[in-house]
Amino acid sequence: MKFMELGFRPDTFYTVESVRSVSSDLLNDLVIQVKSTKYLLHKFPMLSKCLRLKNLVSSQETETSQEQQVIQLVDFPGETEAFELCAKFCYGITITLCAHNVVAVRCAAEYLGMTEEVELGETENLVQRLELFLTTCVFKSWRDSYVTLQTTKVLPLWSEDLGITNRCIEAIANGVTVSPGEDFSTQLETGLLRNRSRIRRDEILCNGGGGSKAESLRWWGEDLAELGLDLYRRTMVAIKSSHRKISPRLIGNALRIYASKWLPSIQESSADSNLVLESVISLLPEEKSSVPCSFLLQLLKMANVMNVSHSSKMELAIKAGNQLDKATVSELLIPLSDKSGMLYDVDVVKMMVKQFLSHISPEIRPTRTRTEHRRSRSEENINLEEIQEVRGSLSTSSSPPPLLSKVAKLVDSYLQEIARDVNLTVSKFVELAETIPDTSRICHDDLYNAIDVYLQVHKKIEKCERKRLCRILDCKKLSVEASKKAAQNELLPLRVIVQILFVEQARATLATTRNNITTNETAVLKRSFTTRREEGGQEEEERDETKPSGGFLQSTPSRFMALCAIPRQPKKLLCKLLSISRSLSQRI
């Protein structure tokens, strides 16, 4: 750390019963009261360098003729130590200045008026010497600039008026972003800050700190985390806006350190915690992956609990949505603080999914709008070519991008967790499930498990809601194990069970005879399936239009029941499907 020594005389100040005096052959003719300390001094050395004291003494001489004049400095900035250093400078006593006390002495010298206007002779007054020390020593050192900035919080208004705060922030920002080989050598990628500056010793004595010696082995992000919110925010803004670009990842790491230090420790005051959180969010870099998705989701959880502004929440959701493929299910369980009764914020997760889809490929969107009516996905897409494909393949010609498949699996796992919420509505569940495009789900096993969990927790939902919930399930994309479980699930609508059994039986039948099926025969079967689907769909829509409103709905036969006249009992249902299988084999 750099320091400056002024003066050459030994220290002759002493204390007698809380009164500070100077050892001298001359009688004391000036009494100065600073805070609770009284100083017995002499007019000549003090008035020759302090314009304020000179004016105060001059105004009192016209009113009183006492030999000892008493001056009370009631609004003196800082503590008595700063005043005493200024007084010793007036007497020529050696004083040592460094980053720890230069701000207090600079403010005291400004208050006392120790400028060139009152200085007698050719030597500079204290204000000029302090400014020279700040410019040539303190602001050339990252560590000294940081320590000096820390001390400005004791005298914030004076430091602002004198420009010390802004100059410290500017010096710190330059020290962080400067390139190697100049006054600072900042090893940014390893997180170490080393100072190799060599300061010229001009008219004042600057000592301390070797040129090649490492000034600090601590990362600058850890040091800045010790600052108060206002100084930290201003410093980070200066670093981000510097003409020398710094890695966004380092900015993000610094913000993570600051958030981990301050957010958990200010639970007493929600206003303070909100202010810290809002500031951290506003300082987040725009670049993707500059901060981990886990950190963004952690901030989003805090934002929901602390009720920060809606714009801040949306900013976090957008940033997290851009890298949703790196999230985990537990990180997506964002608590909901409103009075809806739901445990988790499903809407913000839905927004993140949509943001991810638009970010990774703007052309990708859910295949169905909210107001669009449709039957289940299995009913919409049944055709023989797809049934003949091996299990696990997609219904499209090409597999979806790996990131889309990963997010689809993440959403399905998330649905399994939130399905346990007794207050979760079917609409919320379905809307989130439908944000994933149909082609992005390679397998519907996880989606079925989520539906099963929801039905087990919400056994009293109406039949129309149960039917709506199961429409998002594509039976063709269920594995053998999932199909077996679903066929025996009494909570599923009977129509869904019929679809599952039909698809399984059709797949098994076609698997044994696919080598013998001609193109014409396949076309005939395909037209047969299409005709039956249209007839069953028309009959189902007519029944939906005549269904009673309110209470539990009467059971409506599914289109497959209408097609095949399948009884409601599972055993008879299975027998009927077996007969369908035999008839198909005979036709083939």
From Swiss-Prot:
<protein>
    <recommendedName>
        <fullName>BTB/POZ domain-containing protein At3g26490</fullName>
    </recommendedName>
</protein>
<feature type="modified residue" description="Phosphoserine">
    <location>
        <position position="378"/>
    </location>
</feature>
<keyword id="KW-0833">Ubl conjugation pathway</keyword>
<dbReference type="InterPro" id="IPR000210">
    <property type="entry name" value="BTB/POZ_dom"/>
</dbReference>
<dbReference type="GO" id="GO:0016567">
    <property type="term" value="P:protein ubiquitination"/>
</dbReference>
<dbReference type="Pfam" id="PF00651">
    <property type="entry name" value="BTB"/>
</dbReference>
<feature type="domain" description="NPH3">
    <location>
        <begin position="218"/>
        <end position="507"/>
    </location>
</feature>
<dbReference type="GO" id="GO:0005886">
    <property type="term" value="C:plasma membrane"/>
</dbReference>
<comment type="function">
    <text>May act as a substrate-specific adapter of an E3 ubiquitin-protein ligase complex (CUL3-RBX1-BTB) which mediates the ubiquitination and subsequent proteasomal degradation of target proteins.</text>
</comment>
<feature type="region of interest" description="Disordered">
    <location>
        <begin position="529"/>
        <end position="554"/>
    </location>
</feature>
<dbReference type="InterPro" id="IPR011333">
    <property type="entry name" value="SKP1/BTB/POZ_sf"/>
</dbReference>
<feature type="modified residue" description="Phosphotyrosine">
    <location>
        <position position="448"/>
    </location>
</feature>
<dbReference type="InterPro" id="IPR043454">
    <property type="entry name" value="NPH3/RPT2-like"/>
</dbReference>
<comment type="similarity">
    <text>Belongs to the NPH3 family.</text>
</comment>
<comment type="pathway">
    <text>Protein modification; protein ubiquitination.</text>
</comment>
<keyword id="KW-0597">Phosphoprotein</keyword>
<feature type="modified residue" description="Phosphoserine">
    <location>
        <position position="376"/>
    </location>
</feature>
<feature type="domain" description="BTB">
    <location>
        <begin position="28"/>
        <end position="99"/>
    </location>
</feature>
<dbReference type="Pfam" id="PF03000">
    <property type="entry name" value="NPH3"/>
</dbReference>
<dbReference type="InterPro" id="IPR027356">
    <property type="entry name" value="NPH3_dom"/>
</dbReference>
